[in-house]
């Protein structure tokens, strides 16, 4: 599609910076939500062009296109945008997270002490027969089957 070079460069810069691009499947939208002043149609067509050359992978779900840069696409955009190799897309950067503290009874001083015996006490069978309230004759395969015939073609009704 014929589009101004500044629009194509803006699309490629955003794609390289983020590593991904999302666009709603709306060819008549006046502008793309992330790229101001650029029509959604131009974004979709530029990404389709990159997809046909194998520089991005495309996913489509719920009326939205999702494009992910491939390694070849990163190299192509570095050459096209004249970027040094030190600059990488946001998807390749490691996110720095603080060590998360695990919540639970392990770290709380006010939590009651538990042992393995306490946790498995509910699994044990009752010690007295009177306390046993489970039925042994329930479940699949425990009932006696009885075929009495029915309303079929071979036998009339009784």
UniProtKB/Swiss-Prot annotation:
Residues 149-158 have a biased composition (Gly residues). It comes from the Eukaryota. InterPro entries: Plectin_eS10_N (IPR005326), Ribosomal_eS10 (IPR037447), WH-like_DNA-bd_sf (IPR036388). GO terms for cellular component: cytosolic small ribosomal subunit. Keywords: Cytoplasm, Ribonucleoprotein, Ribosomal protein. One of its GO terms (molecular function) is RNA binding. The keyword Acetylation does not apply. Transmembrane segments: none annotated. It holds the Pfam family S10_plectin. It is found in: Cytoplasm. Residues 99-158 are annotated as: Disordered. Signal peptide: none annotated. Its main location: cytoplasm. PANTHER family: 40S RIBOSOMAL PROTEIN S10, RIBOSOMAL PROTEIN S10. Belongs to the eukaryotic ribosomal protein eS10 family. This is Small ribosomal subunit protein eS10. It comes from Spodoptera frugiperda. The lineage of its organism: Eukaryota, Metazoa, Ecdysozoa, Arthropoda, Hexapoda. The gene is RpS10.
């Amino acid at each position: 599609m014929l589009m101004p070079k500044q629009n194509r460069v803006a699309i490629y810069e955003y794609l390289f910076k983020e590593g991904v691009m999302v666009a709603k499947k709306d060819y008549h939208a006046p502008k793309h939500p992330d790229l101001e002043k650029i029509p959604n149609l131009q974004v979709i067509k530029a990404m389709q062009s990159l997809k046909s050359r194998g520089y991005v992978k495309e996913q489509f779900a719920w009326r939205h296109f999702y494009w992910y840069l491939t390694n070849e696409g990163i190299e192509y955009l570095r050459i096209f945008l004249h970027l040094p190799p030190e600059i990488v897309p946001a998807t390749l950067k490691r996110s720095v997270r603080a060590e998360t503290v695990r919540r639970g009874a392990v770290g709380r001083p006010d939590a009651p002490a538990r042992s393995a015996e306490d946790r498995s006490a509910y699994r044990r069978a009752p010690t007295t027969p009177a306390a046993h309230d489970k039925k042994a004759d329930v479940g699949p395969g425990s009932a006696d089957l009885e075929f009495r015939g029915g309303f079929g073609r071979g036998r009339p009704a009784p």
